[in-house]
Protein backbone atom coordinates (compact mmCIF):
# COMPACT_ATOMS: atom_id res chain seq x y z
CA UNK A 1 0.00 0.00 0.00
CA UNK A 2 2.80 2.38 0.87
CA UNK A 3 4.59 1.63 -2.42
CA UNK A 4 1.34 2.35 -4.28
CA UNK A 5 1.16 5.86 -2.82
CA UNK A 6 -1.45 5.43 -0.13
CA UNK A 7 -1.17 8.06 2.58
CA UNK A 8 -0.63 7.46 6.25
CA UNK A 9 -0.68 3.69 6.71
CA UNK A 10 -0.95 2.75 10.38
CA UNK A 11 -0.15 -0.79 11.45
CA UNK A 12 -1.08 -2.40 14.75
CA UNK A 13 -0.02 -5.46 16.66
CA UNK A 14 -1.45 -7.00 19.82
CA UNK A 15 -0.23 -3.99 21.82
CA UNK A 16 -1.69 -1.33 19.53
CA UNK A 17 -0.28 1.14 17.02
CA UNK A 18 3.28 0.47 15.84
CA UNK A 19 5.34 3.65 15.98
CA UNK A 20 8.95 4.38 15.12
CA UNK A 21 11.00 4.51 18.31
CA UNK A 22 8.69 2.27 20.34
CA UNK A 23 10.49 -0.17 22.61
CA UNK A 24 10.08 -3.88 22.08
CA UNK A 25 9.54 -3.85 18.30
CA UNK A 26 10.76 -6.94 16.48
CA UNK A 27 13.04 -6.41 13.45
CA UNK A 28 10.15 -6.51 10.97
CA UNK A 29 8.13 -4.00 12.99
CA UNK A 30 11.19 -1.79 13.36
CA UNK A 31 11.70 -1.78 9.59
CA UNK A 32 8.06 -0.99 8.79
CA UNK A 33 7.93 1.70 11.49
CA UNK A 34 10.30 3.85 9.42
CA UNK A 35 7.88 4.11 6.48
CA UNK A 36 4.46 3.90 8.15
CA UNK A 37 2.54 5.91 10.77
CA UNK A 38 3.95 9.17 9.45
CA UNK A 39 2.15 11.22 12.12
CA UNK A 40 3.72 9.11 14.91
CA UNK A 41 0.36 8.24 16.41
CA UNK A 42 0.10 6.10 19.53
CA UNK A 43 -2.75 4.14 21.06
CA UNK A 44 -4.81 1.03 20.52
CA UNK A 45 -6.54 -0.30 17.39
CA UNK A 46 -9.63 1.77 18.24
CA UNK A 47 -7.48 4.91 18.09
CA UNK A 48 -6.02 3.88 14.72
CA UNK A 49 -9.52 3.44 13.27
CA UNK A 50 -10.70 6.96 14.15
CA UNK A 51 -11.20 8.82 10.83
CA UNK A 52 -9.51 5.95 8.96
CA UNK A 53 -10.52 5.28 5.36
CA UNK A 54 -9.86 1.54 5.56
CA UNK A 55 -9.16 -1.36 7.90
CA UNK A 56 -7.32 -4.44 6.66
CA UNK A 57 -7.33 -7.18 9.26
CA UNK A 58 -5.44 -10.45 9.18
CA UNK A 59 -5.39 -11.24 12.86
CA UNK A 60 -8.07 -12.78 15.07
CA UNK A 61 -11.84 -13.09 15.38
CA UNK A 62 -14.08 -10.42 16.88
CA UNK A 63 -11.33 -7.84 17.30
CA UNK A 64 -13.28 -4.91 15.82
CA UNK A 65 -16.64 -3.61 17.02
CA UNK A 66 -19.35 -1.74 15.15
CA UNK A 67 -18.61 1.20 17.47
CA UNK A 68 -15.02 1.24 16.22
CA UNK A 69 -16.23 1.13 12.60
CA UNK A 70 -18.60 4.03 13.32
CA UNK A 71 -15.56 6.26 14.00
CA UNK A 72 -14.11 5.57 10.54
CA UNK A 73 -14.41 7.88 7.53
CA UNK A 74 -17.08 6.01 5.52
CA UNK A 75 -14.79 3.04 6.02
CA UNK A 76 -13.80 0.12 3.88
CA UNK A 77 -13.44 -2.95 6.09
CA UNK A 78 -11.50 -6.01 4.95
CA UNK A 79 -11.78 -8.41 7.91
CA UNK A 80 -9.93 -11.49 6.71
CA UNK A 81 -9.32 -13.66 9.78
CA UNK A 82 -10.68 -17.15 9.07
CA UNK A 83 -12.98 -18.80 9.80
CA UNK A 84 -14.32 -15.95 11.94
CA UNK A 85 -13.40 -12.43 10.77
CA UNK A 86 -12.31 -9.53 12.98
CA UNK A 87 -15.87 -8.25 12.59
CA UNK A 88 -18.83 -9.92 10.92
CA UNK A 89 -20.07 -8.11 7.79
CA UNK A 90 -23.50 -7.27 9.23
CA UNK A 91 -21.87 -5.64 12.26
CA UNK A 92 -19.43 -3.65 10.11
CA UNK A 93 -22.29 -2.44 7.93
CA UNK A 94 -24.33 -1.55 11.03
CA UNK A 95 -21.35 0.51 12.16
CA UNK A 96 -21.41 2.47 8.92
CA UNK A 97 -18.89 0.66 6.72
CA UNK A 98 -19.34 1.53 3.05
CA UNK A 99 -17.75 -1.71 1.80
CA UNK A 100 -16.98 -4.96 3.60
CA UNK A 101 -14.92 -7.93 2.46
CA UNK A 102 -13.85 -11.07 4.31
CA UNK A 103 -11.82 -14.17 3.58
CA UNK A 104 -14.98 -16.26 3.52
CA UNK A 105 -16.80 -17.49 0.43
CA UNK A 106 -20.22 -17.29 2.11
CA UNK A 107 -20.13 -13.46 2.22
CA UNK A 108 -19.86 -10.95 -0.63
CA UNK A 109 -16.39 -9.67 -1.59
CA UNK A 110 -14.30 -12.70 -0.70
CA UNK A 111 -10.70 -11.49 -0.39
CA UNK A 112 -8.61 -14.59 -1.06
CA UNK A 113 -5.02 -15.14 -2.14
CA UNK A 114 -6.26 -17.70 -4.66
CA UNK A 115 -7.11 -14.68 -6.84
CA UNK A 116 -3.44 -13.76 -7.06
CA UNK A 117 -1.10 -16.72 -6.83
CA UNK A 118 -1.87 -18.73 -9.97
CA UNK A 119 -1.61 -15.73 -12.30
CA UNK A 120 1.42 -14.15 -10.63
CA UNK A 121 3.31 -17.45 -10.61
CA UNK A 122 2.31 -18.24 -14.19
CA UNK A 123 3.51 -14.81 -15.31
CA UNK A 124 6.75 -15.06 -13.35
CA UNK A 125 7.49 -18.52 -14.71
CA UNK A 126 6.71 -17.49 -18.28
CA UNK A 127 9.32 -14.71 -18.17
CA UNK A 128 11.73 -16.74 -16.00
CA UNK A 129 11.65 -14.13 -13.25
CA UNK A 130 13.96 -14.83 -10.34
CA UNK A 131 11.79 -12.91 -7.88
CA UNK A 132 8.30 -11.45 -7.49
CA UNK A 133 8.80 -7.68 -7.57
CA UNK A 134 6.68 -4.87 -6.14
CA UNK A 135 5.79 -3.84 -9.70
CA UNK A 136 4.53 -7.36 -10.46
CA UNK A 137 2.36 -7.30 -7.32
CA UNK A 138 1.00 -3.86 -8.20
CA UNK A 139 0.16 -4.87 -11.75
CA UNK A 140 -1.57 -8.01 -10.51
CA UNK A 141 -3.67 -5.93 -8.11
CA UNK A 142 -4.72 -3.57 -10.90
CA UNK A 143 -5.53 -6.48 -13.21
CA UNK A 144 -7.72 -8.13 -10.58
CA UNK A 145 -9.39 -4.81 -9.74
CA UNK A 146 -10.22 -4.25 -13.40
CA UNK A 147 -12.08 -7.55 -13.70
CA UNK A 148 -15.31 -5.99 -12.39
CA UNK A 149 -16.63 -3.53 -15.01
CA UNK A 150 -17.52 -0.10 -13.60
CA UNK A 151 -21.21 -0.62 -14.34
CA UNK A 152 -21.18 -3.79 -12.18
CA UNK A 153 -19.38 -2.26 -9.19
CA UNK A 154 -21.50 -2.18 -6.04
CA UNK A 155 -20.61 -2.30 -2.34
CA UNK A 156 -21.32 -6.05 -2.53
CA UNK A 157 -19.35 -6.61 -5.74
CA UNK A 158 -15.90 -5.02 -5.69
CA UNK A 159 -13.67 -7.98 -6.48
CA UNK A 160 -13.78 -10.95 -8.84
CA UNK A 161 -14.87 -14.30 -7.51
CA UNK A 162 -12.19 -16.99 -7.26
CA UNK A 163 -14.44 -18.93 -9.66
CA UNK A 164 -14.26 -16.21 -12.34
CA UNK A 165 -13.15 -17.97 -15.54
CA UNK A 166 -11.18 -14.89 -16.65
CA UNK A 167 -8.65 -15.36 -13.83
CA UNK A 168 -5.36 -16.75 -15.10
CA UNK A 169 -4.87 -20.30 -13.85
Regions found by a protein language model. Give the residues of each.
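A broad, structural surface signal
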Residues: 3, 47-50, 66, 70, ...
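Long hydrophobic segments that form regular secondary structure
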Residues: 41-94, 128
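Adenosine-phosphate binding glycine-rich loop
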Residues: 81-169
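Glycine-rich phosphate/diphosphate-binding loop of Rossmann-like nucleotide-binding domains
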Residues: 1-56
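Short acidic, glycine/serine/threonine-rich loops at helix termini
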Residues: 3, 14, 20-25, 67-69, ...
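Structural motif
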Residues: 8-10, 53-56, 75-78, 97-100, ...
